[in-house]
């Protein structure tokens, strides 16, 4: 499904969810790697369309820049067993099929981030997409987004999904849970 099919599907699914089941105050958008980029593209598209946004977002090792200009793609090539420039180039070609890699719907790092919900970004120091995550953090912060960046020492791409055997991943899952609870159940955290 070439660009923008995934984003169109995500918009349809989110709008259906909010209409039929859960108010956005109880909804969190999350994604990892390309899914993290898609989650961010969804948020920026919803905001641009004037839709109500979810309560928060969680982005794990987000791939948010399909121009592939991040230095960490090369600097961390020997440290990240899951992500390679060659693999990402292949994915960009298949997904964009000649479309502009700077299009905000494909590379949400280039989108207007103002007005987005509180966002948790998790990335490892050995992740080839480290620069995508840190640049996103900086741009989101400058746009006024309440963003939290967790850069885990010596962790690689998508490390939080390895919670069955990696203690650092279990800590990340706990952090994600606390973040989600804090933003979806505010009455549970009141001091009154």
Language-model segment annotations:
Residues 1-192:
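Alpha/beta-hydrolase superfamily serine-hydrolase fold, recognizing
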């Amino acid at each position: 499904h070439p660009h923008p099919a995934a984003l169109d599907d995500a918009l349809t699914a989110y709008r259906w969810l909010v209409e039929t089941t859960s108010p956005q105050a109880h909804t969190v958008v999350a994604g990892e790697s390309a899914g993290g980029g898609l989650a961010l593209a969804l948020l920026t598209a919803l905001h641009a369309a004037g839709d109500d946004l979810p309560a928060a977002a969680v982005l794990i090792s987000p791939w948010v820049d399909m121009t592939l200009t991040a230095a960490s793609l090369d600097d961390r090539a020997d440290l990240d067993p899951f992500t390679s420039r060659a693999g990402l180039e292949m994915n960009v070609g298949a997904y964009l099929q000649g479309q502009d890699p700077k299009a905000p719907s494909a590379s949400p790092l280039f989108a207007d981030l103002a007005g987005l919900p509180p966002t948790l970004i998790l990335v490892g120091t050995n992740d080839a997409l480290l620069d995508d995550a840190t640049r996103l953090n900086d741009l989101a912060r400058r746009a006024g987004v309440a963003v939290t960046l967790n850069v885990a020492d010596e962790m690689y791409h998508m490390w939080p999904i390895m919670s069955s055997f990696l203690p650092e991943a279990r800590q990340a899952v706990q952090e994600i849970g606390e973040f989600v609870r804090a933003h979806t159940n505010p009455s549970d955290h009141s001091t009154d």
